[in-house]
Swiss-Prot record:
Its cofactor is Ni cation. Pfam families: Amidohydro_1, Urease_alpha. This is Urease subunit alpha. It is found in: Cytoplasm. GO terms for molecular function: nickel cation binding; urease activity.
Length: 577
């Protein structure tokens, strides 16, 4: 019997069970734990497209029609990285949703073919062999300041945006809020034709429930509480009362100046109710110096943003000027300068690294154009994971040594921008993971460019963005290769591939007809009974204490020392600037 070496097999079909892959130029190594489409026990039955290969008529391609159940698209031999595992499989897509994760082909002549993955004449093939697939990224902290953020986000592997704004208005530059039904309607209409899922946050800074309900009817799928609009205990309580009744989430940016109380008062106002805590580290805002302690509480689902990810020798110098611009502060006013300086604490930024690594801070967003960079959510997540491996070694459960892997750490970090924000905002029934039944929002990566530049971005089953060479060349690959929009990104098509997430109230009020929206509106679901324990691999609740004088952070009694990174992967090897 002819046998293939692992090296030869990987060149033909991609790596298989037991093979290890480095992610970009990081020290992170994944190991495939299962191969559902080939490898040991299934070798020789792989579904591969191309001249002289398997997926041809009466061979790997069956006679099954689309009406008979054939998928629209199959991604062959993909290495799936998700919170639930790291495996290799064929992925089937039909009507914009994932219908199968297993083995594709023709059951008439091939063993073990998943009934949902029978390739027919109506099936398109995307070669996932030697490529990694992740769920489309969810940026849970977006300032909608300019429309140019959308292509930047897609180019970074983001397919869902959660946040608020109306454009380059001062309120939007600072606060992730789309205030009022009129602005909400205009933003939903403006974004209707983009291949990007959208969840808008209305302004929750009011004690008038009617003002919040009209925003829910107008398209808000949650509320933002921001200190620049006045986040008092009364406002927090009033907003959460409406959120509980409407089943939507509240994102909290608390009171840096401690004008209306301290972190203990904010927690008392929250009263054990579910809440998404923005800027948990405090550099972007929130009670100084100890907002970071909210990551210890079971009802608080904490996130931080990418400008402080990871802590480097340049982080502090960059932040002061950014903060002055973002929050409309005046350097000539001593109080404004003191306000800015109170946020930028190296000890809490350093502790943010560790809290992400142990799963105590659960999510990472961008804070786009308001201190953060929308195209770097994915990249900075993996830079943080790399830095933490260098400093702390293998996580519990990850084998160390020359034959070890980082599967547990990788699964934890990918969850921070996929399933965890989806659960937090009640949209995990549609997106957030590579699972059957969910929207086919998927990102393909070459391993050498993982987290840096996607090979292709699939939105609702259509390729909307991809690395593409010169359009006047004889083949698709000649330089310059740029991330470019594809046919499915054209507005008439894109509206059918993406969704607006709204409150159940908006659905009942027939918002789609009132605004003449083309895309599907999807209500949030099961939001208010969620807590930190529901966030996969990111549910740790350590004891966190901050010294009010020195800002020293103790996590479970241990001081976390500051060691800012001087060099990062996924940086100058890939970028000119």
């Amino acid at each position: 019997m002819t046998r293939l070496t692992r090296e030869h097999y990987a060149k033909l079909y991609g790596p298989t069970t037991g093979d290890r892959i480095r992610l970009a130029d990081t020290d992170l190594i994944i190991e495939i734990t299962e191969d559902r489409c080939g490898g040991p026990g299934l070798a020789g039955e792989e579904a591969v497209f191309g001249g002289g290969k398997v997926l041809r008529e009466s061979m790997g391609q069956s006679r099954l029609t689309r009406a008979g159940g054939a998928p629209d698209t199959v991604i062959t031999g993909a290495i799936i990285i998700d919170h639930w595992g790291i495996i290799k499989a064929d992925i089937g897509i039909r009507d914009g949703r994932i219908v199968g994760i297993g083995k594709a082909g023709n059951p008439d002549i091939m063993d073990g073919v998943d009934p949902a993955l029978i390739v027919g004449p109506s099936t398109e093939i995307i070669a996932g062999n030697n490529r990694i697939v992740t769920a489309g990224g969810i940026d849970c902290h977006v300032h909608f300041i300019c429309p140019q953020i959308l292509p930047e986000a897609l180019s970074g592997g983001i397919t869902t945006m959660i946040g608020g704004g109306t454009g380059p208005a001062e309120g939007s530059k600072a606060t992730t809020v789309t205030p009022g039904a009129w602005h909400l309607g205009r933003m939903l209409q403006a974004l209707d034709g983009w291949p990007m899922n959208i969840l808008m946050l209305g302004k929750g800074n009011t004690v008038n429930p009617d003002a919040m309900w009209e925003q829910l009817r107008g398209g808000a799928a949650g509320f933002k509480l921001h200190e620049d609009w006045g986040t008092t205990p009364a406002v927090i309580d009033a907003c959460l009362r409406v959120a509980d009744e409407a089943d939507v989430q509240v994102a909290l940016h608390s009171d840096t100046l401690n004008e209306t109380g301290f972190v203990e008062g904010t927690l008392a106002a929250i009263g054990g109710r579910a809440i998404h805590a923005y800027h948990t580290e405090g550099a972007g805002g929130g009670h100084a110096p100890d907002i970071i302690t909210v990551a210890s509480h079971p009802n608080v689902m904490p996130s931080s943003t990418n400008p402080t990810r990871p802590h480097t020798v340049n982080t502090l110098d960059e932040h002061l000027d950014m903060l002055m611009v973002c929050h409309h502060l005046n350097a000539a006013v001593p109080e404004d300068l003191a306000f800015a300086e109170s946020r930028i604490r190296p000890s809490t930024i350093a502790a943010e690294d560790l809290l992400h690594d142990i799963g105590a801070i659960s999510m990472i967003g961008s804070d786009s154009q308001a201190m953060g960079r929308i195209g770097e959510v994915v990249m900075r997540t993996w830079q943080t994971a790399h830095v933490m491996k260098k400093r702390r070694g293998a996580l519990p459960g990850d084998p160390s040594g020359p034959n070890g892997n980082d599967n547990n750490r990788v699964r934890r970090y990918v969850a921070k921008y996929t399933i965890c924000p989806a659960i937090t905002h009640g949209i995990d029934h549609e997106i957030g993971s590579v699972e059957v039944g969910k929207l086919a929002d998927l990102v393909l990566w070459e391993p050498a460019f993982f987290g840096v530049r996607p090979h292709a971005v699939i939105k609702g089953g259509g390729i909307v963005w991809a690395a593409m060479g010169d359009a006047n060349a004889s083949i698709p690959t000649p330089q310059p290769v740029f991330p470019r929009p594809m046919f499915s990104a054209m507005h008439a098509v894109a509206a059918g591939l993406a969704v607006h997430f709204v409150s159940p109230t908006a659905i009942e009020d027939d918002l789609a007809a009132r605004l003449a929206l083309r895309r599907r509106l999807v209500p949030t679901r099961d939001v208010r009974n969620r807590g930190k324990a529901d966030l996969p691999l990111n549910d740790a609740m350590p004891d966190i204490r901050v010294d009010p004088d020195t800002f020293t952070v103790r996590i479970d009694g241990e001081v976390w020392e500051e060691h800012p990174a001087a060099e990062l992967p996924m940086a100058q090897r890939y970028f000119l600037f």
